[in-house]
């Protein structure tokens, strides 16, 4: 019985190494054309996105807004790129007085809808996001529709992260998850993975609320005698901020160093553990980003440094080979398996 555990963290600086030395390392060069969270996860699973998803720097078009308002019975406010926290400070009061939905986007391909839980019931907010997901097709097909319920009083609004819900577009091609499930292997997920892949190819899952909750659920899954993949998202949504990447990357590495022993303690002889980051940064503007990959396990070649590897899809190719699945989906098999 073989198991592969793939853990995705927040941003880590390319040259950082955990205190517990990995058995093997690699630097993965991202191939997908738009560096969004969703395409990073898809590429790790073998699906490279060469066509950028649409973004809306000027907000969503009026024709769509009219259809959405008619379908939901609510007007919307904002409708432009905005910081998630700042939009509550600037428009939370307007929303609670009027009942209008807060619609905002970002630099990524995303439609975010926020509402106070006492103004719009959370289940209704979910329904409105499902409506948006159906209306956003063709040139409007964003990668993710996100429900962002919040609570609190004016000046002290905060998102209810455990009630955050993501409605992703379905992957445009086959992924490692599909290949494993079709081969009757287990595919477990923790965190936002279930949403990022629109539930496709996953046999069991747990959503999580932040790093620590995700870690505990990952460790619980590792207690099971399963045969296949555990794909765990431990990210807290903290990318390597351009303003202070050193501070953010250091904090994320400290979290890994503190908790890596817990993961390694649960590794069995036939397990392999791959740890990488959801985001990173490039010193050159426009250059494809590199994601550090740390590999552990008795079946990993000790001391192997794979250097720069083109594509995050080398992770899926290597895991598929290790688990005995013939399908590869592209990407190089890393020279780390004994």
Locations of regions flagged by a protein language model:
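Feature captures the catalytic ectodomains and active-site-proximal regions of enzymes
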Residues: 1-338
């Amino acid at each position: 019985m073989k198991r592969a555990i793939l853990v995705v963290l927040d941003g880590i600086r390319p040259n950082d190494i955990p205190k517990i030395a990995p058995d093997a390392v690699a630097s993965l060069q991202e191939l997908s054309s738009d560096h969004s969270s969703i395409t990073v996860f898809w590429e790790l699973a073998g699906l490279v996105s060469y066509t950028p998803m649409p973004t809306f720097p000027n907000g969503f078009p009026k024709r769509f807004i009219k259809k959405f308002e008619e379908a939901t019975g609510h007007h919307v406010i904002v409708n432009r790129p905005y910081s998630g926290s700042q939009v509550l400070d600037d428009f939370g009061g307007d929303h609670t007085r009027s009942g209008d939905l807060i619609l905002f986007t970002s630099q990524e391909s995303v439609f975010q809808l926020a509402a106070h839980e006492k103004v719009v019931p959370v289940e209704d907010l979910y329904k409105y996001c499902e409506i948006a997901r159906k209306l956003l097709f063709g040139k409007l097909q964003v990668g993710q529709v996100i429900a962002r319920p919040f609570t609190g009083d004016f000046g002290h609004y905060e998102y209810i992260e455990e009630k955050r819900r993501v409605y992703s577009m379905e992957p445009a091609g086959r992924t490692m998850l599909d290949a494993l499930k079709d081969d009757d292997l287990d595919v477990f997920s923790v965190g936002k993975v279930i949403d990022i892949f629109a539930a496709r190819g996953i046999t069991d899952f747990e959503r999580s609320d932040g790093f620590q909750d995700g870690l505990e659920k990952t460790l619980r899954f590792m207690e099971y005698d399963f045969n296949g993949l555990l794909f765990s998202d431990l990210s807290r949504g903290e990318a390597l901020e351009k303003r202070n990447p050193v501070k953010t990357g250091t904090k994320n590495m400290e979290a890994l160093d503190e908790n890596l022993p817990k993961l390694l303690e649960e590794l069995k002889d036939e397990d392999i553990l791959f740890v990488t980051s959801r985001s990173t940064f490039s010193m050159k503007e426009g250059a494809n980003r590199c994601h550090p990959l740390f590999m552990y396990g008795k079946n990993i070649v000790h001391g192997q440094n794979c250097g720069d590897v083109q594509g995050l899809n080398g992770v899926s190719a290597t895991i598929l080979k290790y688990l005995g699945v013939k399908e590869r989906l592209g990407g190089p098999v890393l020279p780390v398996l004994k």
